[in-house]
Swiss-Prot record:
One GO MF term attached to the UniProt entry: toxin activity
Sites of Leucine amide modification: 14
Keywords of this entry: Amidation, Antibiotic, Antimicrobial, G-protein coupled receptor impairing toxin, Immunity, Innate immunity, Mast cell degranulation, Membrane, Secreted, Target cell membrane, Target membrane, Toxin
Example GO BP: innate immune response
Tissue: Expressed by the venom gland.
Location of the protein in the cell: Secreted; Target cell membrane
Gene Ontology CC terms: extracellular region; membrane; other organism cell membrane
Family statement: Belongs to the MCD family. Mastoparan subfamily.
Species, as recorded: Eumenes micado
Name listed for the protein in its UniProt record: Eumenine mastoparan-EM1
Function in brief: Linear cationic alpha-helical peptide that acts as antimicrobial peptide. Has antibacterial activities against both Gram-positive and Gram-negative strains. Has no activity against the yeast C.albicans. Shows moderate mast cell degranulation, as well as leishmanicidal activities (IC(50)=36 uM). Has no hemolytic activity. Its mast cell degranulation activity may be related to the activation of G-protein coupled receptors in mast cells as well as interaction with other proteins located in cell endosomal membranes in the mast cells.
Amino acid sequence: LKLMGIVKKVLGAL
């Protein structure tokens, strides 16, 4: 799983 990718996406959405 690419947790970092998901986290980056969430942070970018903020």
